[in-house]
């Protein structure tokens, strides 16, 4: 079985999808999984060894140059590449109108969340098959539950991210214990005030 996963962005959304992929790798090891995501987050998708191939889109760049021929040429090449893969189906785990539009590029049946479960209910109109996943749960649980329903297995009790971190990206010889502060975000509305960071770090250092 050959599947295209559509989870375009942002960084946190891709990370929250990794435990579902680990479940799939353990429960259905014969699945060939491809992943379509925003180019800027492709390295996150590459961290999981079960993902055989990454297909990248550049919507954050394309939307600024929609009237340029080069933009549509790149979109056309992406369409062609996806359609040549002959997927059994496309799984849109993001549940947005944008992700549904990119999922349709592949021209294969799309599976996804139903209108009451998706973040944008209209996205479900593009799906050949839909699944109900409660909104009240956290993102990791919802992704794992969606995958479990789509591929027909019971969600494992243990949550595992299954990452393979390249040697060059590993931090070594750090004194224990240590803290990692992740401050970056692609949206200003998610930024935390500097004084809050200072207060947190001072508290941790006590």
Feature names for model-found ranges:
Residues 1-206:
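Catalytic machinery of carbohydrate-active enzymes
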């Amino acid at each position: 079985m050959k599947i295209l996963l559509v989870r375009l962005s942002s960084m946190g959304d891709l990370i929250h999808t990794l435990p579902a992929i680990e479940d799939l790798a353990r429960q259905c090891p014969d699945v060939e999984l491809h992943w379509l995501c925003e180019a800027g987050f492709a390295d996150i998708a590459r961290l999981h060894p079960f993902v055989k191939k990454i297909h990248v889109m550049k919507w954050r760049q394309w939307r600024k140059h929609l009237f340029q021929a080069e933009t549509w040429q790149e979109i056309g090449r992406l369409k062609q590449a996806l359609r040549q893969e002959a997927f059994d189906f496309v799984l849109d785990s993001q549940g947005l109108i944008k992700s549904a539009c990119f999922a349709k590029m592949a021209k294969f049946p799309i599976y996804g969340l139903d209108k009451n479960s998706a973040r944008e209910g209209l996205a479900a109109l593009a799906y050949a098959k839909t699944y109900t996943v409660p909104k009240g749960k956290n993102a990791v649980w919802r992704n794992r539950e969606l995958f479990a329903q789509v591929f027909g297995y019971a969600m494992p009790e243990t949550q595992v991210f299954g990452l393979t971190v390249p040697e060059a990206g590993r931090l070594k010889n750090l004194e224990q214990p240590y803290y990692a502060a992740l401050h970056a975000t692609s949206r200003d509305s998610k930024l935390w005030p500097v004084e809050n960071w200072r207060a947190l770090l001072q508290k941790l250092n006590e």
